[in-house]
């Protein structure tokens, strides 16, 4: 089932320096909660400055949904320590609140008023809040309080030059973009390995179903927790943050221009369903527009091609201008066993897997094959640890045992690990392979199995509160290592100043400005 990458691995072993200079970055979302686990109703902590313009700490959907962002980094340890400093400073500056350590929220009642993230009075800030108003009206606020970790990854120019020859200008844009689309197609075919190993949301609180019937064969505990005994990541299931209306958009990942055209079409395509919501009611705007996507960021995807945008530029226009610059992996649940929601083992695994995806052949995928890959993902998401589980390739009927496919994949990853270790020194990547491959013979070692044992004992709420309390105490006590207190104070003041400058620079009323941007 795994493509034959022996030739590509042999090539890599002859060109190990092609992997020197991998760049990566992390984003971690987490809900601010009270000591009893309920959602914090306070505004964004003052010490964290402006969520609109802060370089490292912002908010996602809700005012209580923090998002931590590391700069691009070539050093894994440095990146994780930077992320930990962001958590340490925040833990010391959020009063008696804690950071929820799980992807799925718990103590949120059906119909509870969840305050949307606020970004001030600039047109840009008001637009961001209106976008969130649209998300709330389309999918419900509860779905938007699910948290995850995003891992951003780019291969060094040395890799592309070794692979594609001496490339520059438009040629480089085309060939590098084609290379990243290969990564994306392989990710759709084999990325289910990520929720298998690291999925950590096998259960939900009963409030999450909002009284709606479900066809999933949930088991229920006395405390009202619903779980699937072999599930890995309900966050990635249809119960989590997915957009069913997007499933027939036909966006593909074969070619830069084809992909961008599909994306641009989606933000222009009217939706009958969202038209029913209306655009405005009693003088209050309800969504940016009633199209399938309000803006490009609304496209739900487990992985995205990205380029840093310039001021006023849309993500797709940035891609057209310069091609794909990096890949954003979006399938990681919060790691409940780490105070910062992600750990070194996961980052090293993702490095290995992304390199493998760049090496393995990846035939072009039609939108129908893309839909077929979802079958494998759903199996792993809902019953990934089930004995005897099999997976297919695309739309073909042949089935293969998941543990065997996983072990075959790790045989390749071990060779990538040897190459990365040879240029970085030590055996850190090989050690990760040895630790994780054991999960295929013993699913009890996976994150989902480990966290489910705790949840069955103490419920999602009890588990979440215990971890949150322990991590709060730990992070508040730890000294900063990379950033200093004065760095945070300076960024707080600078971010507030940047927001004020944006607000002062606006000349158009929001309604007029919105007509040009909706």
Curated annotation (Swiss-Prot):
Keywords linked to the UniProt accession: ATP-binding, Glutathione biosynthesis, Ligase, Nucleotide-binding
A Pfam short name: Glu_cys_ligase
Entries under InterPro entries matching the protein: Gln_synth/guanido_kin_cat_dom, Glu_cys_ligase, Glut_cys_ligase
GO cellular component, one term: cytosol
Gene3D superfamilies per UniProt: 3.30.590.20
Catalytic activity: L-cysteine + L-glutamate + ATP = gamma-L-glutamyl-L-cysteine + ADP + phosphate + H(+)
One function term, GO molecular function aspect: ATP binding
Superkingdom, natural source: Bacteria
Keyword hit for Nucleotide-binding: yes
E.C. numbers: 6.3.2.2
HAMAP family (UniProt xref): Glu_cys_ligase
Protein name listed in UniProt: Glutamate--cysteine ligase
Source species: Escherichia fergusonii (strain ATCC 35469 / DSM 13698 / CCUG 18766 / IAM 14443 / JCM 21226 / LMG 7866 / NBRC 102419 / NCTC 12128 / CDC 0568-73)
Lineage summary: Bacteria, Pseudomonadati, Pseudomonadota, Gammaproteobacteria, Enterobacterales
């Amino acid at each position: 089932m795994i493509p034959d990458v022996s030739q590509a691995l042999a090539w890599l072993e002859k060109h190990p320096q092609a992997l020197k200079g991998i760049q990566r970055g992390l984003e971690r979302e987490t809900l601010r909660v009270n000591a009893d686990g309920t959602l914090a109703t306070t505004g964004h902590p003052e010490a964290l400055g402006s969520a609109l313009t802060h370089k490292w700490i912002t908010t996602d959907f809700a005012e209580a949904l923090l998002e931590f962002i590391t700069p691009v980094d070539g050093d894994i340890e440095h990146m994780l320590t930077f992320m930990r400093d962001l958590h340490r400073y925040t833990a010391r500056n959020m009063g008696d609140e804690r950071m929820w350590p799980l992807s799925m929220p718990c103590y949120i009642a059906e119909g509870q008023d969840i305050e949307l993230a606020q970004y001030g009075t600039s047109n840009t800030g008001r637009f961001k809040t209106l976008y969130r108003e649209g998300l709330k009206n389309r999918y419900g606020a509860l779905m938007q309080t699910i948290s995850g970790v995003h891992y951003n990854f780019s291969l060094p120019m040395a890799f592309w030059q070794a692979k594609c020859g001496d490339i520059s200008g438009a040629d480089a844009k085309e060939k590098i973009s084609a290379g990243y689309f290969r990564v994306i197609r392989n990710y759709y075919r084999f990325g289910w390995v990520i929720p298998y190993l690291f999925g950590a949301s096998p259960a939900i609180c009963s409030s999450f179903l909002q009284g709606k019937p479900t066809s999933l064969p949930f088991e229920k505990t006395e405390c009202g927790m619903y779980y699937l005994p072999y599930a890995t990541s309900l966050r990635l299931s249809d119960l989590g943050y997915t957009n069913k209306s997007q499933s027939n958009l036909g966006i593909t990942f074969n070619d830069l221009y084809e992909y961008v055209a599909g994306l641009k079409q989606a933000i222009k395509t009217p939706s009958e369903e969202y038209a029913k919501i209306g655009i405005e009611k009693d003088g209050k705007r309800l969504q940016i527009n009633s199209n399938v996507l309000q803006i490009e960021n609304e496209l739900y995807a487990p992985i995205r091609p990205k380029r840093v945008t310039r001021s006023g530029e849309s993500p797709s226009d940035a891609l057209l201008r310069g091609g794909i610059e990096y890949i954003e992996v979006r399938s990681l649940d919060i790691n409940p066993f780490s105070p910062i929601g992600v750990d070194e083992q996961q980052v090293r695994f993702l490095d290995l897997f992304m390199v493998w995806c760049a090496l393995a052949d990846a035939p072009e995928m039609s939108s129908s094959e893309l839909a077929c890959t979802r079958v494998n993902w759903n199996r792993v998401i809902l019953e990934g640890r089930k004995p005897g589980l099999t997976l297919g390739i695309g739309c073909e009927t042949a089935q293969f045992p998941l543990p065997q496919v996983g072990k075959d994949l790790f045989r390749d990853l071990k060779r990538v690990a040897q190459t990365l270790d040879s240029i970085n020194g030590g055996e850190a990547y090989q050690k990760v392979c040895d630790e994780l491959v054991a999960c295929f013979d013993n699913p009890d070692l996976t994150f989902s199995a480990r966290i489910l044992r705790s949840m069955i004992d103490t419920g999602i709420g009890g588990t979440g509160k215990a971890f949150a309390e322990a991590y709060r105490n730990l992070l508040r006590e730890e000294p900063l290592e990379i950033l200093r207190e004065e760095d945070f104070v300076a960024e707080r003041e600078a971010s507030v100043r940047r927001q004020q400058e944006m607000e002062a620079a606006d000349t158009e009323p929001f309604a007029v400005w919105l007509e040009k941007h909706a």
